[in-house]
Every structure is written in C-alpha cells, then in structure tokens.
Amino acid sequence: MNFVGIIAEYDPFHSGHALQLRMLRQQGASTIAVCMSTGVVQRGGVPILPEAVRVRAALAAGADLVVALPAPYANASAEQFAAAGVHLLAALGCDTLAFGAETPEPAPLQAAAAALCSAAFPAALRSQLESGLPFAAARAAAAETLCPGAADLLQTPNNILGIEYCKAILRQGAAMQLLPLPRLGAAHGTAQTGQVQGQALASASHIRQLVHTQGIKAASPFVPQAAMELYRQAAEQGQLADPEKFSTAVLTLLRTKTPEQLSTLRGAGEGLENRLYAAAREAETVNDLYDRLKTKRDPTARLRRLVLDAVLDVPAAGLPALPPYLLVLGAKRSALPLLKHAKIPAGTSLAGLAGQDQKLQIAADMHSKAVDFSLLCRYKIQPMGHAYTAHVVLL
C-alpha cells in the first residue's frame, strides 16, 4: 500500500474522517488522495459547507490531495457514484481504495460484487421482481441465490457502497487493492454518538442536524479543532447551507419546467415526469414535494436525486458516462507532481480543462451550474461562476 484513495463527501469533515486518515497512515499509506463530492451531494442536496472549506479541513487533517467528484456524478445512484470515484482515483494512479464498511474483510464484498456483475444476475433479478418484491429487496434476494450471504451484506449502508466500489473495480479492470475499514463510533445516518480513542464521534447527518437546529457551535465536540475554526469562519461569513433557501430555489426552478422538459431528464420515465410536474405545483416545501412523490416502488433517495437533476437540467443523454477530467481542489505542494502521471486530463483550473475538448466542456458546464445552484442556497448568496474562477487550495 503506497498511494491510497478515498471517495468521500465530507459533509461535513468530522473527527471520524480524521481518525480514518490517521489509521491509513499507521497502516503504511505514504500518499492519500480524496475524491470529494462537489457542488451537490449523493443524497440529492447541497453540502452544508462550500468545497474550499471542506478541502482545507481534509488537508489539515492529513490528506495530501483532494480532487473533485463533479456534481453530475455526485448526485447519482450508489452504482454511478462509485463508478465515477473509482475511475478518477484509478486515473490518478491510486493502488489502494480505502472505505468504511460494516464488514471489514474484502473477500465477502468482492464475492457479492461478482454475483451482481455476473451474466446470471439479470434473470435472477427479473424473477424476484416478478414475484412482487420492491427493487432493493428483489436485488438482495437475487444476489443471495448466486452468492449465499450477499443479502445480509446488502442491508447495511457502508457495505452497499463498498460492494459498488468492488463492482466498479471489477468492471473497469482497475489495478486497485481494497482496504475496508471498520466504521467506528456512530452508525451511518443516525443520531447515535460514540467515542473512540477519547474522541467523540457522530455521523455527518447528525452533525448537520445539530448545526441546522442549534448553530455551528453544536458541531464542536465531533469535529477536529482546525476544522472547527474553519467552520466558525464560514458560518460568520454566511457560507452555511440554508435549508429554506434550498427549498425555495428547488420549487421555483421546478415550476418553470414543462412535462416535455422533465421527460428528457436522467432518471425520468414511467410517468415520473408527470408526477413531478404536478407535485411541484402543489408542494409548499421541498420536503412536502418529496412526500407527494413518494411511492412504495420509488426509494426516497432516487426521488431526491431526480428532483435535483430536474433543477439542474441533467439530461438522460449527452453527459459522459464517467468524469472526463481530474480537477484538483486542494493539495499539499509535494503531491502536485502526481498529476503528471494521470491517465486523463488533470489540472487545477476547470476553465483550462474545459477548453480541451467538447466532452470536457459539457461535463464542466454541468458541474459549474450545480456549484452556482449550491451557492444560491447559502445564508449569504454568492455570485455565479465560482467553479470556473476558484483557486486551488495549496498547503
């Protein structure tokens, strides 16, 4: 293990993330690169803090390099999210992929991934769906018929994402070893807290909830001191995400769309565009919108991502399947020479990358639009064009 990659959101960066970086150093990582969601996040929202703040927090805690997971690939299914992150880290030259998992051994995750990628899986899935099971349950049951034990692995959030990483490595033929790390302290997406090595830990979702209800100081027990200072400054400058502005912006933009426009979106179809069109005209808040769209068939996470795709006009066709560039958001100066060996266009300027060809321009423009939207949803609204003018963070 020499060059370790992590795919993360850092929404926000907290003490659990810092502990993970320390663990990797202790296990022999000489260089750590992070592929971080930018503009938007995988749950179909905007990050609580802007990219530069999260990048500085990660670098201060031990990361060597932070590259962007561009917005259209961040607001995506677990499969697409994982594929994009693996592609970027492999292109950067990482030899190991580290990730949190409830099952800290790679072999069971790899076996489940192989089953999901097998030629026999589509027929097995179809059989389970025809029995009336919802998609997630049908997928787990189908995987179980091909790989005993897979269904249990597909019940826990970190294992689910870990299996998607394994699938991406398998499909892309990426030369990366897997390093699952046990999730320490608080469980993913819960209000539980824990303590490891004398450090209080909480999930990112719990920290976001604390900040939204009690203010930025409430995050202090669960965030490294250096990061906390960055967060205080960001809060004072009005850079925190404002849920009410997000809600208003989403409904405002959705109400300008026609059913025809919505039908061209990524993830639309089967009448979803008509449901979205009708719900947007009745909903009073974005959470009300999600409730109106909800069905037993469609997971809430999928609907949240569809809503954000509609706001950002992400099309069903035209976007490259995988990110076509490596945009460095921040780095220790000693890590910058690694870019010379990248297998896809790499640099510190989005404008410079976008100008190289049409494919890069399309992806960059979609990313820039998402960053602009994110900055519209801050307590203090920021000017447009930030993605193209932002400076790399160097330490």
Model-predicted segments: where are they?
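A glycine-rich helix N-cap at a beta->alpha junction
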Residues: 56-70
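Short, contiguous strand/loop micro-motifs
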Residues: 7-8, 41-42, 58, 72-73, ...
